[in-house]
């Protein structure tokens, strides 16, 4: 049967439209699942700006994302929960020594506080706790929830000999951040070049990109590929967006965000040494009087503030520091606050911290004014 010119045109139009529909269907984001999340571990949590909460379960080799409900009452200016460790332990029905707060994140809309908690002993358990505006603690069930999930395919297998004796399988995910539609996940992999940054487009498609990271370690006098990032954030330096990362013992290095996205292996630029025997536990970016700053909480030092101006002028460090506790590189302001174990932004006036009181040993969740 012959087909005239108009018939061929119609056929071509139909085929083009059909191809467009098929392409659109292929590009459609995956729908969330409905069911139970059974965590084997919980080492890191973070939000995106829409209130999606991401949960890292390295022992279960998964990262999950769940929608969270926001509070309707006005956001508080301040929040204080004294003896937070005792309250968490009481909620779990265990002694204080058997409950550990491993991470904290502030809901970007409601300003409610979310805690990642591990209960040790038998059976061990990882769970989420939410703190409302009045300081009340509520355990969150992960049963019958809508969620997204993606696999961590490169984490060290149980029984793997790790590069350092103090490394653990939980360090497969040490920190996470949501940047420009992607979840960045730092930690150890099961590969010889073990320090890694993974990227997952959200909603998850179970596909990821990763780059193996290397830095010059200013306390250890060597280029290291097995030191995991302890904490990191996106931060502009010299007009370009970078990942600013803190390492144990305790260099601070930058990685170009563009280079992270376009390389399989990448050597960062070490900009500062905060002193040996220390671990940066958290860092956040904030503005004060029109200037950009990074605030770093440390395990064995005071809090430290670095300015964007000083980071812009930072020169690469490529030689060992002359002593075990010597600092070097980018200048910082030492803040007279110690014992800060968790740190996040709260509002325009305050941070939220979990801090060990050096006078009585209590562990408290509280707001800290941005006066510096």
Where does each model-flagged region fall?
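Sec/Tat signal peptide C-region and signal peptidase I cleavage site
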Residues: 23-27
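Bacterial N-terminal signal peptides that target proteins for export
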Residues: 2-13
């Amino acid at each position: 049967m012959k087909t005239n010119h108009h018939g061929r045109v119609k056929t071509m139009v139909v085929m083009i439209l059909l191809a467009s529909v098929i392409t659109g269907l292929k590009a459609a984001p995956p729908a969330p699942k409905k069911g139970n999340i059974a965590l084997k571990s919980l080492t890191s949590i973070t939000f995106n700006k829409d209130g999606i909460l991401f949960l890292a379960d390295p022992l279960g080799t998964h990262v999950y994302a769940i929608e969270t409900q926001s509070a309707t009452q006005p956001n508080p200016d301040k929040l204080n929960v004294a003896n937070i460790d005792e309250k968490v332990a009481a909620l779990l029905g265990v002694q204080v020594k058997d409950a550990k707060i491993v991470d904290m994140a502030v809901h970007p809309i409601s300003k409610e506080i979310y805690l990642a908690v591990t209960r040790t002993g038998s059976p061990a358990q990882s769970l989420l706790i939410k703190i409302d505006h009045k300081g009340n603690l509520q355990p969150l069930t992960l049963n019958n929830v809508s969620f997204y999930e993606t696999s961590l395919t490169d984490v060290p297998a149980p029984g793997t000999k790790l590069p350092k004796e103090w490394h653990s399988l939980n360090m497969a995910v040490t920190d996470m951040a949501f940047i420009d539609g992607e979840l960045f996940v730092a930690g150890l992999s099961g590969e010889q070049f073990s320090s890694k940054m993974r990227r997952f487009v959200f909603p998850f498609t179970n596909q990821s990109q990763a780059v193996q990271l290397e830095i010059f370690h200013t306390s250890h006098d060597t280029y290291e590929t097995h030191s995991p990032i302890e904490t990191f954030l996106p931060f502009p330096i010299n007009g370009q967006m970078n990942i600013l990362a803190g390492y144990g013992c305790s260099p601070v290095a930058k990685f170009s965000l563009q280079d992270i996205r376009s390389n399989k292996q990448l050597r960062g630029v070490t900009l500062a040494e905060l002193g040996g025997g220390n671990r940066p536990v958290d860092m956040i970016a904030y503005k004060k009087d029109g200037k950009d700053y990074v605030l770093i909480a440390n395990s064995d030092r005071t809090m430290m503030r670095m300015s964007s101006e000083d980071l812009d002028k930072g020169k690469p460090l490529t030689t060992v520091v002359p002593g075990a506790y010597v600092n070097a590189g980018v200048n910082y302001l030492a803040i007279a606050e110690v014992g800060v174990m968790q740190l996040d932004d709260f509002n325009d006036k305050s941070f939220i911290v979990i801090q060990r009181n050096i006078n009585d040993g209590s562990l408290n969740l509280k707001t800290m004014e941005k006066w510096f």
